[in-house]
Amino acid sequence: MGATKKPDLNDPVLRAKLAKGMGHNYYGEPAWPNDLSYIFPVVILGTIACTIGLAVLEPSMIGEPANPFATPLEILPEWYLFPVFQILRTVPNKLLGVLLMASVPAGSLTVPFLENVNQFQNPFRRPVATTVSLIGTAVALWLGIGAALPIDESLTLGLFQFDPTVEYKNLSIFYSYI
């Protein structure tokens, strides 16, 4: 063990700092156990009381009651399976759909090998991983939103529709000036 330097209490700069309260805890009692052992149970019991109170005062059903004699028109999975459901619904070949679903984790596992950087580096300085993550998030949101729509609107999310049976009068006015 090395020798530790003892503070020189005759130093006027150190004495001035100590006189102002610098160098030690001067703002009251410690947080543990005095404060936290009181606040933690109060917060936990308050949360439980609010949950029970809201459940008693305003009971709500979890979805619609089941009716075994009426099958819904389209059976949808839980919300977190919407992107997978959309892949299986839109791809005509089911084997291709399963392969597309298997390619998601396989592609995610290859990203660290594409980019040879330090794992503790700033994520915005890892452009391949950042781009793959952003594109994957956008595609998952697009597939998830599309799964909740009818099949004919699912790929375009209902934003772009063209019906050849409808006469578009605004376009005919536009083309008359050309």
Curated annotation (Swiss-Prot):
GO biological process: photosynthetic electron transport chain
Places the protein is found: Plastid, Chloroplast thylakoid membrane
Membrane topology designation: Multi-pass membrane protein
GO molecular function, one term: electron transporter, transferring electrons within cytochrome b6/f complex of photosystem II activity
A GO CC term assigned to this protein in UniProt: chloroplast thylakoid membrane
Domain of life of the native organism: Eukaryota
Membrane spanning residue stretches: 36-56, 95-115, 131-151
Keywords in alphabetical order: Chloroplast, Electron transport, Membrane, Photosynthesis, Plastid, Thylakoid, Transmembrane, Transmembrane helix, Transport
Cited InterPro entries: Cyt_b/b6_C (IPR005798), Cyt_b/b6_C_sf (IPR036150), Cyt_b6/f_cplx_suIV (IPR005870), Cytochrome_b_C_euk/bac (IPR048260)
Keyword Transferase belongs to the record: no
Subunit structure: The 4 large subunits of the cytochrome b6-f complex are cytochrome b6, subunit IV (17 kDa polypeptide, petD), cytochrome f and the Rieske protein, while the 4 small subunits are petG, petL, petM and petN. The complex functions as a dimer.
Similarity annotation: Belongs to the cytochrome b family. PetD subfamily.
Task performed by this protein: Component of the cytochrome b6-f complex, which mediates electron transfer between photosystem II (PSII) and photosystem I (PSI), cyclic electron flow around PSI, and state transitions.
Protein name: Cytochrome b6-f complex subunit 4
Species assigned in the record: Picea abies (Norway spruce)
